Amino acid sequence: MMYHIPGVLSPQDVARFREQLEQAEWVDGRVTTGAQGAQVKNNQQVDTRSTLYAALQNEVLNAVNQHALFFAAALPRTLSTPLFNRYQNNETYGFHVDGAVRSHPQNGWMRTDLSATLFLSDPESYDGGELVVNDTFGQHRVKLPAGDLVLYPSSSLHCVTPVTRGVRVASFMWIQSMIRDDKKRAMLFELDNNIQSLKSHYGESEEILSLLNLYHNLLREWSEI
């Protein structure tokens, strides 16, 4: 399943990020890509050795970790270090698949269950640059407001179409979920959303408490910690 997570960054945070990224050191995006991806990748990324990068990636991690909808949809166990990319002048990233595992500075290795893109450019400021994701439900084209994030299974083939006008800037990362199976994770997310909706309409009740108990028992049964 694909999920739109709105308002991960406020407009003020986005503006500050963009101002700082104007001063960043950008390098060839292929430095973080395997052999298959390097053949179809043509973009730029912030140099991960820079002091600015260290500060910005920490801010992204803090923002997603504090976002309740992101947590409910991803049920994250491990987050990769966020990266930042930029597309302009017809730069693009052809169809590719993300690696199943990635190195992690604290955990050694992590499994990539979910991929996330946090948009940092207003969609009206550039042409092209859609994230295109192919999954079992068809093809999805994504171009979200700045500050919003999209989550999708890392097993999906995906690409970024050429940016023919303006500049597209984003942060991206991978998530190892506590729930490996996409279908089980989607069921838990739906159950959680329905519980929250019922609570907002009817307040606390024994029936809602019973559903909450069911949610946590399923999470306990399926989670890998």
From Swiss-Prot:
GO terms of molecular function: 2-oxoglutarate-dependent dioxygenase activity; iron ion binding; L-ascorbic acid binding
A Pfam family of this chain: 2OG-FeII_Oxy_3
Enzyme Commission designation: 1.14.11.-
InterPro entries, A to Z: Oxoglu/Fe-dep_dioxygenase_dom (IPR005123), PKHD_C (IPR041097), PKHD_hydroxylase (IPR023550), Pro_4_hyd_alph (IPR006620), Pro_4_hyd_alph_FE2OG_OXY (IPR044862)
Keywords annotated in UniProt: Dioxygenase, Iron, Metal-binding, Oxidoreductase, Vitamin C
Positions that bind Fe cation: 96, 98, 158
Keyword Nuclease attributed: no
GO biological process per UniProt: DNA damage response; intracellular iron ion homeostasis
Keyword field contains Oxidoreductase: yes
Gene3D superfamilies xref list: q2cbj1_9rhob like domain (2.60.120.620), Rabenosyn, Rab binding domain (4.10.860.20)
Cofactor dependency: Fe(2+); L-ascorbate
Cofactor notes: Binds 1 Fe(2+) ion per subunit.
EC class (word): oxidoreductase
Binding-site positions, 2-oxoglutarate: 168
Fe2OG dioxygenase domain sequence ranges: 78-177
Alphabetized PANTHER family for the sequence: PKHD-TYPE HYDROXYLASE YBIX
Name by which UniProt lists this protein: PKHD-type hydroxylase YbiX
